């Protein structure tokens, strides 16, 4: 994971490879791979099925309609994702990887 962490208006976010040209940045988009099958996660329906198989459940108590949230009864972890899959980026991917070690991997798309 390369880039620069930017703190603005009380929010910290990762700006990946800020010095790369636009075409290079577009070619280096990240994808998340489900390791047991080698499948690239390409939609929320696929991701939700995988997360449910790992014990995650949809969480509807957050009140924010712009987010899809998942929780695990056996932990205090909460996964929050933008409802629009086109906004699903490496920050959200790495959050899932950290909370599900050995099941997911983030890599550059080809």
Curated annotation (Swiss-Prot):
Matches recorded under InterPro entries: FPF1 (IPR039274)
Organism lineage string: Eukaryota, Viridiplantae, Streptophyta, Embryophyta, Tracheophyta
Top-level taxonomic group: Eukaryota
One Gene Ontology term from the biological process aspect of the record: positive regulation of flower development
Purpose of the protein: Modulates the competence to flowering of apical meristems. Involved in a GA-dependent response in apical meristems during the transition to flowering.
UniProt similarity note: Belongs to the FPF1 family.
Other noteworthy facts: Overexpression of FPF1 results in shortening of the time to flowering.
Name of the protein described by the UniProt record: Flowering-promoting factor 1
Taxonomic source organism: Arabidopsis thaliana
